[in-house]
Amino acid sequence: MFEGPVQDLIDELGKLPGIGPKSAQRIAFHLLSVEPPDIDRLTAVLARVRDGVRFCAVCGNVSDDERCRICSDPRRDASVVCVVEEPKDVQAVERTREFRGRYHVLGGALDPLSGVGPDQLRIRELLSRIGERVDDVDITEVIIATDPNTEGEATATYLVRMLRDIPGLTVTRIASGLPMGGDLEFADELTLGRALAGRRAMV
């Protein structure tokens, strides 16, 4: 254990996902070794993220405006919506360059053991979005692209149950080929692109 601010920094860094005690200590001592202007730039960026980044009012993706750049782009097909768990998954799908529709970010996946049920996700917003015809466009297809793990599959099954009786709506699931238990963000562009192109109807 270190004393004072150094230990406080290590403790805070250790709260970040994927950062264990040793990594937190290594990062902390790296930060202690850099020049003060570099620390100032880092803290300024963190402050801008805290104060300026919000979630898109339409899809839930991260944005610096009320609408994200994808929802604001008239070239995107508003009739096709790809449902993902987190904003990082939007970036994973975008890297494939295979999808030209829009997104809906749930903010997680169903996980009853962790207290995450339907009310903790943006499922109600998805249903409202389908019913309200955002930008005067009917949503005709919802692509479910939750992670291929237990929570992601449970979320996909729940969404199918909620969406299958909506007239004129096709519900599809990205094809198999992604490793079971993996995350979309770690899939390579070719594999994820093929999974999107080979999506299958669920209803």
Curated annotation (Swiss-Prot):
Keywords: DNA damage, DNA recombination, DNA repair, Metal-binding, Zinc, Zinc-finger. GO terms for molecular function: DNA binding; zinc ion binding. SUPFAM superfamilies: Recombination protein RecR (SSF111304). It comes from the Bacteria. Pfam families: RecR_C, RecR_HhH, RecR_ZnF, Toprim_4. InterPro entries: DNA_Rcmb_RecR, Hlx-hairpin-Hlx_DNA-bd_motif, Rcmb_RecR, Rcmb_RecR_Znf, TOPRIM_dom, TOPRIM_RecR. Residues 79-179 form the Toprim domain. The keyword Hydrolase does not apply. A zinc finger (C4-type) spans 56-71. One of its GO terms (biological process) is DNA recombination. The keyword Metal-binding applies. May play a role in DNA repair. It seems to be involved in an RecBC-independent recombinational process of DNA repair. It may act with RecF and RecO. Belongs to the RecR family. This is Recombination protein RecR.
